């Protein structure tokens, strides 16, 4: 292998993650490469650029789309989606955030990695950027069907119309505009639909030239492939063609406020509906790339907001002045500066002052009295578990690690420190010896920090109609000023785009893997059986990085239609209610010290028969290896001990679930349409629609509106009936961890044993009614449509 111009900058072993961290610089161009070496075969790659918007035209977002519409070596219209079918990738994507655009992928196959690397590098450095692709992905003018009016079209234009219909998206954008009024973060990087048509094709090309230069590029790789091999390919495929080194682009920070600010804005909603107002508070404190400030803020967020026993979350959950805590509650580390956010939804404008007084009183109490040391240590343990956990819920671990360091890398700060958290966690544990540490955090970050905004977002009837009228008037004026030649140009451009979209590209222009490139299937983990006849138990030894997992699977028995419909709420609330003699507050605090826990239902069709269901209720828990006994004890009590006698708590949970579901409608519009369209095709599709579709939201609204004493008691009775059936159901236990964690572990299997009663009927799904509606109305600027087709069974032979 020929040597490259990359030079080493730093190298560190990070034991807590089992990786070797190395940083390299490419002096001829200024490009940087971070390599995370380990023996993980799921190798990952990312190239990222600072994309600093100067307006809300969505230029960075539209450029992200347009780069993936063909490049110099791969001049096909849609190489990204074509590669999805020609690749063994475990992940492929591209995304634009507030100040960065990144292109990540992951795969376990060497040839596939090289194929994807070639396509990605050519796309970002040498894209075609055809004007027709800009028209398709960004925006364009088209004549309406009657030819009498103009309309805006475009993928990103329509995408952002839908995205900005979501109240939470509007809330987030208004908040960041208010917090960072003098920086790029005041702009909508995805694109404001009112501003997107102001972007020109020339501005798009200029933005690419300025931002997508190797001097700005950050390359990241992870896994078992060598750094030198990556560098040789990166230099050969891209960097060798650039001779100029520029000063890198870095986002600026906001000058701190000298006094808190307040803002009220309207959003499209029925002003006649009560309690439709969002009220959120946000503070700016510290730099995202400063590991001490980052972890301190996450610690404070965990202490104040993480669960129902956390003081600020408890206040927002129980106040009669609002329905639920805001979805924006938590820490935002997506920009150069950190943001602490909390608030409520389902309130009134008139309640803002009273809610703020209550919030500041809670913070003042914590600043005065502190919090119990065991509560703070539990929050630190959760931070340590987040550092060590390699699970990822299907998201490749290498890309998770890249996400942790991306902000620091783009800011030209110490990326390694954001991976090696053990030193900062040790400093925090030592700081707990000072009883004034947590009170000082609250005062320094929140109470004494004037860089604060209170945002009230209230319902405003007709706001969307007014914006639509502004757009219609603008288009009408443009149409009136057009002569016949200009109109013909619009029609010709539309025809040219339609012709390009209909053209068949040659897929063989793109690389692919063949069966000869696919290695034999990897060996699955071998289970060590250690259970009994009543509770089969299997342990799986793996490199778990100091995290222990346990999962209890209970076979779903036959349920009534009412019980089947209520099962998602049963699962969601199983970890939110009291247990045995403890109320929910005590349980939340105790379990937070042990780890994290969840419950969910899993129903899958048979490989050859849609009606042959594999149906399970799964209880999962994970924690640090030293807390494995507490994880198992909690898992054993979750089903048997849960209390269905806290009506006020259930009413709170219903309100929160309903508020969350209503706010998610426009965000989940495509998914809701797909679920509804597919509901009558298979039994499991019908169940998906019942549990997650529009009908589920309607049922939740009805349950919340009717959450009186009798209705709550009836729901608890349904939960109790489900629990009784599950307690008698067959079950299996699985334990996952490294050898040191599993050796000597002897779970009390009797605590997991089913109750007497034997095996009842199996779970079945009732068919949906024949007159089921398939159209739903929602407050959105765009429509979501879907058509579903029945596919072959999994066991059908390939052709």
Please describe what each predicted stretch is.
Residues 33-36, 206-209, 261-270, 537-540, ...:
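Short, surface-exposed beta-strand/loop micro-motifs that present aromatic residues
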Residues 37-83, 292-304, 545-590, 633-635, ...:
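Active/ligand-binding-proximal structured segments within catalytic/core domains
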Residues 28-40, 272-280, 288-291, 333-335, ...:
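Active-site-adjacent "gating/activation" loops or surface patches in catalytic cores
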Residues 1-40, 500-548:
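N- or domain-start disorder-to-order transition segments that initiate the globular core
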Residues 2-4, 52, 66, 70-73, ...:
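Charge-rich, well-structured scaffold segments of protease-associated domains
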Residues 3-19, 90-94, 757-766, 773-775:
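Short secondary-structure junctions
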Residues 240-300, 769-791:
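Loop-rich catalytic cores of soluble enzymes, especially ATP-dependent carboxylate-amine ligases
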Residues 314, 324-327, 532-550, 554-566, ...:
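Non-catalytic regulatory/linker segments of enzymes
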């Amino acid at each position: 292998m020929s040597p490259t111009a990359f030079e080493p900058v730093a190298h560190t072993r990070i034991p807590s993650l089992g990786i070797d961290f190395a940083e390299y610089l490419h002096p001829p161009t200024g490009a940087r490469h971070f390599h995370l070496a380990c023996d993980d075969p799921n190798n990952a790659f990312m190239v990222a650029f600072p994309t600093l918007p100067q307006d809300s035209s969505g230029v960075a977002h539209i450029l992200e789309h347009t780069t993936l519409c063909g490049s110099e070596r791969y001049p096909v219209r849609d190489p990204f989606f074509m590669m999805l079918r020609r690749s063994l990738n475990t992940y492929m994507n591209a995304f634009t955030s507030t100040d960065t655009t990144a292109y990540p992928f992951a795969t376990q196959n060497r040839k596939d990695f090289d194929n994807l690397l070639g396509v990605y590098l050519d796309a970002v450095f040498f894209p075609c950027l055809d004007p027709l692709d800009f028209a398709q992905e960004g925006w364009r003018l088209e004549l309406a069907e009657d030819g009498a009016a103009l309309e805006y079209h475009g993928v990103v234009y329509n995408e952002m119309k839908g995205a900005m219909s979501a109240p939470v998206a509007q809330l987030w954008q208004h908040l960041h505009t208010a917090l960072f009024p003098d920086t790029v973060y005041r702009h909508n990087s995805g694109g404001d639909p009112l501003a997107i048509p102001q972007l020109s094709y020339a501005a798009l090309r200029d933005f690419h030239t300025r931002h997508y230069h190797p001097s700005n590029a950050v390359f990241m790789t992870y896994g078992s492939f060598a750094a030198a091999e990556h560098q040789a390919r990166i230099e050969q495929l891209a960097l060798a063609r650039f001779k100029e080194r520029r000063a890198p682009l870095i986002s600026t920070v906001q000058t701190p406020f000298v006094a808190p600010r307040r803002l009220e804005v309207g959003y499209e909603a029925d002003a006649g509906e009560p309690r439709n107002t969002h009220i959120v508070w946000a503070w700016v404190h510290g730099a995202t790339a400063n590991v001490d400030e980052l972890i301190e803020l996450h610690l404070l967020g965990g202490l104040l907001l993480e669960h129902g026993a956390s003081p600020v979350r408890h206040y927002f959950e129980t106040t009669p002045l609002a329905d639920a805590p805001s979805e924006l509650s938590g820490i935002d580390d997506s920009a150069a500066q950190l943001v602490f956010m909390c608030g409520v939804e389902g309130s009134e404008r008139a309640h803002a002052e009273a809610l703020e007084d209550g919030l500041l009183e809670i913070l003042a109490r914590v600043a005065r009295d502190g919090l119990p040391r065991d509560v703070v240590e539990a929050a630190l343990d959760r931070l340590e578990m987040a550092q060590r956990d390699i699970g990822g819920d299907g998201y490749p671990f290498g890309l998770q690690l890249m996400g942790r360091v991306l902000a620091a890398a783009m800011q030209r700060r110490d990326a390694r420190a954001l991976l090696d958290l053990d030193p900062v966690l040790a400093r925090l544990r030592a700081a707990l010896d000072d009883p004034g540490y947590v009170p000082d955090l609250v005062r320094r970050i929140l109470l004494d920090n004037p860089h604060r905004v209170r945002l009230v977002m209230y319902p405003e009837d007709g706001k969307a109609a007014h914006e639509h009228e502004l757009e219609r008037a603008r288009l009408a004026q443009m149409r009136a000023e057009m002569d016949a030649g200009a109109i013909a140009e619009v029609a010709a451009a539309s025809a040219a785009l339609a012709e390009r979209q209909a053209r068949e590209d040659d897929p063989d222009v793109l690389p692919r893997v063949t069966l000869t490139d696919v290695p034999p299937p990897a060996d699955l983990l071998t289970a060590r059986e250690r259970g009994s006849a009543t509770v089969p138990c299997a342990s799986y030894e793996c490199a778990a990085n100091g995290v222990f997992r346990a999962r209890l699977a209970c076979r779903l028995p036959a349920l009534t239609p009412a019980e089947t419909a209520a099962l998602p709420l049963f699962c969601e609330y199983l970890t939110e209610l009291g247990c045995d003699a403890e109320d929910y507050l005590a349980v939340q605090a105790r379990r937070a010290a042990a780890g994290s826990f969840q419950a969910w239902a899993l129903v899958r069709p048979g490989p050859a028969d849609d009606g042959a269901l594999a149906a399970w209720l799964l209880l999962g828990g994970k924690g640090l290896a030293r807390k494995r006994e507490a994880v198992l004890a909690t898992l054993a009590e979750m089903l048997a001990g849960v209390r269905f006698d806290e009506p006020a708590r259930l009413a709170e949970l219903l309100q929160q679930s309903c508020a969350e579901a209503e706010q998610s409608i426009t965000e989940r519009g495509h998914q809701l349409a797909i679920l509804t369209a597919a509901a009558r095709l298979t039994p499991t599709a019908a169940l998906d629609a019942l549990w997650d579709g529009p009908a589920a939201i309607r049922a939740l609204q009805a349950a919340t509106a009717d959450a009186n004493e009798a209705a709550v008691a009836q729901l608890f009775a349904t939960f109790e009936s489900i629990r009784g059936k599950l307690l008698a159901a067959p079950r299996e236990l699985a334990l996952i961890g490294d050898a040191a964690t599993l050796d000597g572990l002897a779970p009390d299997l009797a605590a997991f044993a089913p109750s007497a009663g034997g095996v009842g009927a199996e779970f079945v799904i009732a068919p949906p009614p024949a007159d089921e509606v398939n159209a739903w109305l929602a407050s959105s600027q765009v429509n979501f449509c879907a058509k579903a087709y029945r596919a072959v069974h999994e066991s059908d032979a390939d052709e």
